[in-house]
Amino acid sequence: MATPHINAQPGDFAETVLMPGDPLRAKYIAETFLEDVKQVCDVRSMFGFTGTYKGKKVSVMGHGMGIPSCSIYVHELIAEYGVKNIIRIGSCGAVRDDVKLMDVVIGMGASTDSKVNRIRFSGHDFAAIADYDLLETAVNQARAQQVPVKVGNVFSADLFYTPEPEIFEKMKKLGILGVDMEAAGIYGVAADLGARALTILTVSDHILRGEKLSSEDRQKSFNDMMKVALETAINI
């Protein structure tokens, strides 16, 4: 039965859903990597698709930008459609010195300036972490494909245009790999509902060094990450 934000039918989604922020990126993934593709939802142009990858059922759906948006879609996928595994796929801005453009960053944990997980956990700090089995599978797949990978803590920011740029130096000191806007929220929802979640990111820019990928390199890096994510999805 459709939810307020997803007009798919029961059984339309696979147990594993790959989730980019951009719904057009979800469309690109479905058309480029999946076979026997069916579009299953389009409310608010937040497109979702289900198909097969190497013969196994996989879904892909956009989640929008920021923790409030992604939390709605992840909650409804798990609670209403029985999704078991959420794999966020996106980009991040690096802050640590050893993280380079085109690296793949896998979020073992996710710090945040958002209060959503404290609200969820009665005012206490909640350690927003990835599912270990998903994490291990993704790391092994990246290494098998010789994709440069960094594993560790990311930071999910509420503000894209931060008024406190000095925070990035503090992040670097504390070993944060890079900054996104969703991982901590997705990990919190998954934990709350008993599902598994992972975040896999490409490094599109380095915040402290002012480096940015060209559009061509950005696409290549995304495709490399997608192969890691898809192999993870069918090997868990």
UniProtKB/Swiss-Prot annotation:
Enzyme Commission number: 2.4.2.1
Phylogenetic lineage: Bacteria, Pseudomonadati, Pseudomonadota, Gammaproteobacteria, Vibrionales
Recorded family membership: Belongs to the PNP/UDP phosphorylase family.
NCBIfam families to which the protein is assigned, alphabetical: deoD, PRK05819.1, PRK13374.1
Subunit structure as annotated in this protein's UniProt entry: Homohexamer; trimer of homodimers.
Entry protein name: Purine nucleoside phosphorylase DeoD-type 2
HAMAP family (alphabetical): Pur_nucleosid_phosp
Cited CDD domains: PNP_EcPNPI-like
UniProtKB keywords: Glycosyltransferase, Transferase
GO molecular function, one term: purine-nucleoside phosphorylase activity
Any single biological process term in GO: purine nucleoside catabolic process
Natural source organism: Vibrio cholerae serotype O1 (strain ATCC 39315 / El Tor Inaba N16961)
InterPro entries: DeoD-type (IPR004402), Nucleoside_phosphorylase_CS (IPR018016), Nucleoside_phosphorylase_d (IPR000845), Nucleoside_phosphorylase_sf (IPR035994)
Known role: Catalyzes the reversible phosphorolytic breakdown of the N-glycosidic bond in the beta-(deoxy)ribonucleoside molecules, with the formation of the corresponding free purine bases and pentose-1-phosphate.
Protein residues bound to a purine D-ribonucleoside: H5, D180, M181, E182, S204, D205
Annotated binding of phosphate, by residue: G21, R25, R44, R88, I89, G90, S91
